[in-house]
């Protein structure tokens, strides 16, 4: 049921249009950059004469931003909340925010990439990619196995980037993880959100990979920026529905040819984009705040929000 707290201020409808334009124009930036840029512009244009008035403007703009049908809406929500939390004590200049965070994470995780290791990667993560490229730049020799990552097949993008950097890479089907898991040293993935209990919300398929990794006693590492920390506590997969505005341009194809099945148009297709991985399946999280155990996430959230 709608309440007054969900009423949108039409004066800030422009933030959604601007956000979507920035995302389409700069596909390689994380959600943090346009979000911070837009909220900074809200501050510059605000006619508020008090901190409370400014906070109200920012909250109204943030409510509009959170309506964007964008598949990283959990991260977007976290960025908005953290920005408003620190707006009175943070500079409005964020020129290299994204780049600096990735460099720091790469440095902290560097010792985990040793010569000769084989790493399993799922989906496309800018932080994971930066971490791997940094290790290759240092002359480390390692190989990567990348899942196809349906339904958007983002694994192809990851594989292409790694191949362009002369990093040995192999692309596999999502269903082939259990077949190759004994050949990898550990799993490395990104996150759309890191929740209060140290679990993560990420690309669909992450949870089942973590289950396979644990069964074979393979470490499961997560690399993500701290702006993805969110005050949410999902207990199961269905709880994710309340955390996001899940959006995908089109559902996956059931088969290559209609002759392969009868009446394909009558099939009910479910193509979720995200799933929840509990903290018990995660070994460590690499963030710019440090290398954390899942149990340490709640402490960091307290520092960020309180």
Regions found by a protein language model. Give the residues of each.
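Short, well-ordered loop/turn elements at secondary-structure boundaries
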Residues: 114-115, 217
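A short, well-structured juxtamembrane/interface segment
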Residues: 101-114
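Short, glycine-rich nucleotide/cofactor-binding loops
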Residues: 23-26, 44-48, 118-124, 196-202
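Long amphipathic alpha-helical segments
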Residues: 1-100
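Conserved phosphate- and dinucleotide-binding cores of soluble alpha/beta proteins
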Residues: 2, 14, 129-130, 135-141, ...
